[in-house]
Amino acid sequence: MDDESKPPAPDLFEHFARTAEAVAATTKKLKKAAILGEYFATLTHDDLARAARYFAGQPFALSDARTTNVGGSILSAALMNATGANAEQLSVSYTRWGDGGDAAFEVFSAAKLNNLPSLTLVRTESLLARLSATRGKNAKTDLLSETLSRATPLEAKYLVKLLSGDLRIGLREGLVEDAIARAFHQPLTEVAMANMLRGDIGEAAVRARTGRLHDVEMRLFHPLKFMLATPASDLADIARTMPGEFLVEDKFDGIRAQAHVENGRVGIYSRTLDEISARFP
């Protein structure tokens, strides 16, 4: 068996990336969930939490206010620094694939850097935290360039996808919840409830593995995931969906907000779970 076919160590980001490739290769939801579940079972508790968030396209838990603030210009500059590609080459790749991660894979493959897999899930978490704490475009670019210069093409592909906020492998948060439930033989409703109450699919995954889904409670100033409306074509459609009695009311324009209040302290959170208290008097 050559090195290419050997599965990488579970804690490596390369293993995460190969699993993502396998998920992307099938359109069957049950197969996607099975692939994820098999991978999740190989991880430590901490790496399970990290991987669950990353597969949901979340660099940080939804309840975590941090963001990386890494946009397309920083990603492009870092990719060029790491590979020696020029702006035209990167633009051609992006136009061909329409995805930053796929473009990264192409320019990294062309560069033939011969890097070995070395990025771990914990070092990925550290990089994301440092990017969040770093101020200034140049400083962020230098930090990301340093990591990418040691990356394999597959590591670069999925690091760029993660920083973009969407892996684009036919996977949504609900399917990650389903994979967690199947992997650890827990009710999907309890996994989803834990994720909603904590705003952290990583914590929900660890609780599912350790059998601690039942004791999840809401915490003030830790926002809950919002329940979003489901569109209906007409009243008959609503009646079919909700055969019992129901009320209908006008929808008012505005924002969805969540208010947490205790002992004079007020926290207001947006539908993306960001704190927006300072925007209100």
Regions of interest found by a model, annotated:
Residues M1-P281:
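N-terminal nucleic-acid-engaging modules of covalent nucleotidyltransferase systems
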